Amino acid sequence: MTQQRRILITSALPYINGVKHLGNLAGSMLPADVYARVMRLQGHDVTYICATDEHGTPAELAAQATGQSVQAYCDEQYEVQRKAGEGFNLSFDWFGRTSRPANHTLTQHLAQQLEKNGLIEVRTSKQVYAVDDGRFLPDRYVEGTCPHCGYEKARGDQCDNCGRLLDPVDLINPYSAVSGSRNIEIRDTDHLYLLQTGMQDRIRDWVNAKGKNWPSLAVSIANKWLDEGLIARSISRDLSWGVKVTDADGNPRPGFENKVFYVWFDAPIGYISATQEWAEATGNDWEKLWLTDKGADQTEYVQFMGKDNVAFHTVSFPVTLLGSGEPWKTVDKLKAFNWVTWYGGKFSTSQKRGVFMDQALSLLPSDYWRWYLISNAPEGSDAAFTWEGFQAAVNSDLANVLGNFINRITKYCASKFEGKIPETGTSGDAEAWMANELAERLPRLIEFYEAMEFRKAAAETRAIWAAGNEYLTKAEPWVKYKNDVDGAAVGVRAGINLAAIFGIIAQPIIPDAAKKILDALGIPEENRKMPAGSKPEDFAALLDAIPRGHAISPPDVLFQKIEDSQVEEWTAQFGGGKE
């Protein structure tokens, strides 16, 4: 067993405005879950934290559209997202909320620390004001034409088309997202500004040191922001919903009574506050995960996110933590993902493009989706979701390579050996070949997971399953049984042990199917850790690990094949196939 490590994992906080689509899932929460499961299966001390991101203009706009208060809307949507996460077997140790008191308190505290250290100041700025609405229009409350690419539905904080961050006053032909009014003025308003410029060199040094453990995508995005030069950014907004701006005594700050902190200032702080919620609810210690003078220097902190969140996590959030002057833990390893594309565009919550988590679960169980999204993870480049690709992955990898192997070997053991691990026979060339395959492939599988290369890990998992099928072709227990029962016994014994190995290594990606396999084989919980070894004989022993004479039972069919008619139906239902 490797030395136990303490690992903190966070995935980008899903925004509260509705069920997340499969692109959101594939770009943060799902790979973080797979990584958490792998680390737990190796005996490490893992804490996987996530939360709903509940502040900002989209929450207010969505609540208005439903006729609810923002609080009621967020309460309802939190439950929707929590249940969707459970449906996909996301193994959060805690799924918190940024609207809870812990996040308000910590956000206000960190802002005070930053101001004490000269990194926050009040500035008067020009902001969009809707005369007919009688209010300022921050962020997504204003829409218009992007000044960079000409996209006509750009929002005040970011253009969905080119991805550039925007200031509402930059939009061409702006209009109110609330009323549609174009009776717009530019007026002065006071806001808090985070003076990132003063942290430029420190953040550059930090990125250079930490970026060695990041994929090139994340490093390039961070360096792009740094190369362009960090600027002072407004961290307050003219909104009513959010973390209130307070003074050093915790009272409303004069002149800021109707303002809150910008959502991108408080949201990543939610990683810490959600961990505090977890600690309070479970009796655990949050400080050893987040404060380097309380043990967090011995914690590995791993973040997962889509590429659109990288700049905030590699620049803005580190400015907050490092600039506070307090011993906060910053990220060690960062995994950034590209987009999952949907027939010519990207998945989009606002435009209702693609398949959403609740819709997916109404079609098929979560393992089907988990396998396809991880085996097709958007790592080196964007990855296309297609119904045909989904069908091929399920039918080939899950139904054929894994499912048929489990079905064949367990049913044969039940019919010819009374459902018990055979006790006779001596291993031969086929078993030696299979042991060599395991000796080569199992360590490589762990290496891929350690490197957070999920497509390669899924491919290696499948390759191990495929090697097991090739082993059965070499061993031919059903042929040998006629004249050499002992020879057949060796093949069945090794085959059942392979089925257990296949179930164990499947646990991170397809946990439900893995549990069905391991339960049917009667594998105790304590024997479901990831297989490890250092010598050839360690891997040979895996083919004879289950006690001889142990009773097993064939599981039900693990995966149903996806029929062409289903692909046609789903294509029509969700609009796939239309470029």
Swiss-Prot record:
One of its GO terms (molecular function) is ATP binding. Keywords: Aminoacyl-tRNA synthetase, ATP-binding, Cytoplasm, Ligase, Metal-binding, Nucleotide-binding, Protein biosynthesis, Zinc. It catalyses: tRNA(Met) + L-methionine + ATP = L-methionyl-tRNA(Met) + AMP + diphosphate. Belongs to the class-I aminoacyl-tRNA synthetase family. MetG type 1 subfamily. A motif ('HIGH' region) lies at residues 14-24. Signal peptide: none annotated. This is Methionine--tRNA ligase. NCBIfam families: metG (TIGR00398). GO terms for biological process: methionyl-tRNA aminoacylation. ATP binds at T349. GO terms for cellular component: aminoacyl-tRNA synthetase multienzyme complex; cytosol. A motif ('KMSKS' region) lies at residues 346-350. Its EC number is 6.1.1.10. It is an enzyme of class 6 (ligase). Is required not only for elongation of protein synthesis but also for the initiation of all mRNA translation through initiator tRNA(fMet) aminoacylation. Binds 1 zinc ion per subunit. InterPro entries: Anticodon_Met, Met-tRNA_ligase_1, Met-tRNA_synth, Methionyl/Leucyl_tRNA_Synth, MetRS_core, MetRS_Zn, Rossmann-like_a/b/a_fold, tRNAsynth_Ia_anticodon-bd. Monomer. Its cofactor is Zn(2+). Zn(2+) binds at C146, C149, C159, C162. It is found in: Cytoplasm. Transmembrane segments: none annotated.
